[in-house]
Amino acid sequence: MRHTILLSIVVIAAFTGCGGQTTRTTTPPKAKTMNCTLDICGDKKIQNPTESDIRQAVFALDTKKVDAFLILGPTDMTYIQTGGDQNVGFKLEYQETDTKHHYRANRDLTADEIVKALVAYSTGADESKTMAEWDLVRW
């Protein structure tokens, strides 16, 4: 009888945590980092750019001096790209796998918005796609 009671207590404790309240929390998953290359005006490429690299590249763009564009992506057919500068604003486009899936933001964005979009894209976050409404580009 004593063994049965002891076994019952052990079983109850195992399932209820000895009567103490337990709180379960889940850690949000870390954003996955894509293997991306940042192409700066066709002159310089940075493999897996940091947020600092992206910010510096965006704020350095100047349409009066050179072709001012950035392309960030894992392949030649999957990428996000921008053109412009702080004075004229920035266009933003992205493409997924082929030219049938090429989209352009329907408004100009600020330099800070471009940094946010490119950083989000580089980590695999969908935030870059929710910053604007997108129009399908028909070639």
Model-predicted segments: where are they?
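Positively charged n-region of N-terminal signal peptides that target proteins for export
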Residues: 1-4
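Hydrophobic helical h-region of N-terminal Sec-dependent signal peptides
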Residues: 6-12
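C-terminal motif of bacterial Sec signal peptides marking the signal peptidase cleavage site
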Residues: 14-17
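Bacterial signal peptide processing site
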Residues: 19-21
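Negatively charged, low-complexity tracts enriched in Asp/Glu with abundant Ser/Thr
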Residues: 27-73
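Short glycine-rich, low-complexity/disordered patches
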Residues: 63-77, 126-139
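Intrinsically disordered, low-complexity regulatory segments enriched in Ser/Thr/Pro
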Residues: 79-109
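Mixed-charge, Lys/Arg-enriched low-complexity segments
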Residues: 104-139
